[in-house]
Amino acid sequence: MGCLDVRFCRIIFALYSLIRKYGAWLVIPAMLGGAAFLADSVLTPAVSISSAVEGLKTLPALEHLFTENKDLTMMITAVIIVILFAVQSRGTESIGKVFGSVVMVWFAFLAIVGVVAIGNDWSVLAALNPYYGIKFLFSPNNATGLALMGTVFLSTTGAEALYSDMGHVGRGNIYFTWPFIKVALVLNYFGQGAWMLHNQNNPELADAEGINPFFQMMDPNVRYVAVVLSVTAGIIASQALITGAFTMVSEATGLNWMPHLQVCYPARTRGQLYIPVVNVVLCVATLAVLLLFRDSEHISAAYGLALTITMITTTILLGIYLWHRSNKFGAVVFTIVFLAIQVLFFAASMAKFLHGGWFTLLLTLAILMIMYTWNEGTKLERSQRRHMMPKDFLPALDKLHGDSRIHRFADNIVYLTSDPDLKRLDTDIFFSIFADHPKRARAWWAVAVETTDEPFTREYSVESFGTDYLFRVRIRLGFKVSQSIPAYLHQIMHDLEKTGELPNQQSIYPKLDADPGIGTIRYVVIHKALMPESKVSGRGALSLQIKYAIRRVAGSPVKWFGLAPYNPLVEVQPLFVSTRRPPRLTRVASQAPKREG
């Protein structure tokens, strides 16, 4: 799939962005798949690192330590997880350069120890014939029934990690190395199978607890190397999912499915990003999973379900894409074949619902609720958005600008807007200027900020509508450039003052940090809110209330754009409020209060 040649890996959302014009219902599998992927990003660090750390139990020199302290592996895993999330803010570009070499060594090691262990029982190679697998699935000896497929599915996990971190490794490298990885994994599984066949009647292992064929099939001295490599590989796999989660949330924000969050770019490319809030949430959630399930065996029960949901939704979206972009018959065959396999795995994974699958579904539904309510709330807000053309707002603003009876609110009043069109004005801004006491100023500014795909873009456009008191500004900033708006706006005002487009505004109360010729500046941020008299459906009201609750946690433009030190005015404008006059009151004669007794 390779992210379908989208410049930066957008995983499942790339498919949705390409096909959403074919049906509104496609938002359902896209959101569900994205939510499941983010749930997987919580489970992967917990299961991959804990399973690797558990290899320490098989080392003869350390065996007694883990026998005496059952929670030691969990504590070691927790420390590694905390360190992993703590270094995210520094970026992984430098250590990412060695990821490829480490992974190559890891899979080469898997292949070698697998080949050595196959010598225990060469009959294991008969598993190359799928007949034996199908025969055992329906055999009376298979006590677990269809649930066996849930265990089989875990052997495929990790595939999503290979493409979730395109920002580090690139699509071409993944395509080139996939055959090598496939062969290495199969050889290793054959080695584990051969060891189990060889030791099925071993009395020393009959009553042993927590047998791990992967480590047990190796010579005790080799296990030390295996533990180091497996922990390193687990960290790399976790890193891939963490980076993938950052990308997923960033793209969900672009689709208006999640709130605007502070995004940092510690590396030189936009494909490698860091979102502080998401990092903290992932870390806390991963530690919670570790504390709840305590070991990799129990975590794996919850692990597979998220992957099957992601795979099913991706297949549906890709099938729709192929239907509209290529051979329709091929698209149908592809979709049916892959869905048949994936639905089988999903049903098998649901057999583990009570053993951990419930947690995966709960986590997925929680993330899905955030996406759905934010999307619905945004659509409701946009349905109320109106714009005015110059002929509608210029006469009133011109009159207010010259009305000396009204004291100036500030020399410059700056509004932030999400509308990049410089030829019109948000009605909300117009209402804010004239509501109650009109906000008279020497100049009004409506500023929109866009983030570009280039790292260091710094440019702006201005529309003044032929006036010297109203300016629509569009600022375009590269993704690595600070978005502190006040500094840029001071420069823009100074530039316009130099060209004569903005009259000199020398304030009688000069500020220490003011540019020459620039007066006082007041920032206004408009928030939408529901009022008791808002006419909106119950479902719509719930979506908006949840969205605003999330917004309070996620932050606001005051923080994103560096406005906090400038004491911005935050105004609330009601949604879905009728403009009709309320019913008139009837005046009645006053009555004297009755005396008691």
From Swiss-Prot:
GO terms for molecular function: potassium ion transmembrane transporter activity; symporter activity. It catalyses: K(+)(in) + H(+)(in) = K(+)(out) + H(+)(out). Pfam families: K_trans (PF02705), K_trans_C (PF22776). InterPro entries: K+_transporter, K_trans_C, K_trans_N. GO terms for cellular component: plasma membrane. The chain crosses the membrane at residues 23-43, 72-92, 98-118, 143-163, 174-194, 226-246, 273-293, 303-323, 329-349, 353-373. It comes from the Bacteria. The keyword DNA-binding does not apply. It is a multi-pass membrane protein. Keywords: Cell membrane, Ion transport, Membrane, Potassium, Potassium transport, Symport, Transmembrane, Transmembrane helix, Transport. The keyword Transmembrane helix applies. Coiled coil: none annotated. It is found in: Cell membrane. Transport of potassium into the cell. Likely operates as a K(+):H(+) symporter. PANTHER family: LOW AFFINITY POTASSIUM TRANSPORT SYSTEM PROTEIN KUP (PTHR30540:SF79), OSMOTIC STRESS POTASSIUM TRANSPORTER (PTHR30540). Belongs to the HAK/KUP transporter (TC 2.A.72) family. This is Probable potassium transport system protein Kup 1. It comes from Bifidobacterium longum (strain NCC 2705). The gene is kup1.
